[in-house]
């Protein structure tokens, strides 16, 4: 029994001490390549969207999305056109007067092999964001938000967003 515990402890220690090198640069995609990157044009695009959202810069935010981009938030069962979502954001921000701070988001872009033609060339962007909002009355709220983006040819095709709506 002691030997089994010692072997398990040794194996755990060995695996805990070895960490794979983080891949930080890959912008090419083919049917057999996979990558996860923390920098590059797709990450810059996500940063641009989050910065524009936080600043209420709706025109800049709109330029990041394709003309046919769709948006789902939380348990939406039907996608909303991104242009309609941005208009909704604009109206909500105008009425609430919120000042939004995105903090320091964590971004990644994942590329995976596919044989499905509808996903060819798409990269999957992910962002974890701790939003802090302050209303014009001074009330503050925080929301941990996860966003998944489908990105192709320098534009976002869709966003799926998960956050606590309370």
Task: Outline where the language-model segments fall.
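Sec-dependent N-terminal signal peptides
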Residues: 6-11
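Hydrophobic pocket/interface hotspot
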Residues: 49, 60-61, 69, 85, ...
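Surface-exposed, charged secondary-structure patches
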Residues: 86-137
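Short, low-complexity N-terminal intrinsically disordered segments enriched in polar/charged residues
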Residues: 18-59, 63
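Short beta-strand edge/turn micro-motifs at domain boundaries
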Residues: 142-166
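C-terminal motif of bacterial Sec signal peptides marking the signal peptidase cleavage site
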Residues: 13-16
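A short gly/proline-enriched turn/hairpin at secondary-structure junctions
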Residues: 32, 64, 70-81, 95, ...
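Positively charged n-region of N-terminal signal peptides that target proteins for export
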Residues: 1-4
């Amino acid at each position: 029994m002691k030997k089994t515990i010692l072997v398990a402890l040794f194996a755990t220690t060995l695996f805990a001490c070895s960490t794979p090198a983080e891949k930080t640069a890959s912008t090419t995609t083919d049917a057999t390549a996979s990558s996860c990157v923390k920098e590059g044009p797709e990450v810059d695009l996500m940063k641009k969207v989050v910065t524009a959202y936080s600043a209420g810069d709706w025109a800049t935010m709109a330029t990041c999305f394709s003309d046919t981009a769709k948006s789902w938030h939380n348990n939406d069962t039907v996608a909303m056109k991104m242009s309609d979502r941005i208009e909704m954001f604009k109206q909500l921000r105008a009425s609430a007067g919120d000042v939004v701070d995105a903090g320091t988001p964590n971004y990644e872009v994942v590329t995976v092999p596919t044989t499905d033609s509808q996903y060819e060339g798409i990269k999957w962007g992910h962002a974890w964001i701790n939003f802090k909002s302050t209303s014009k009355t001074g009330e503050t709220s925080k929301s941990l938000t996860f966003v998944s983006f489908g990105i192709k040819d320098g534009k976002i095709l869709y966003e799926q967003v998960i956050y606590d709506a309370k």
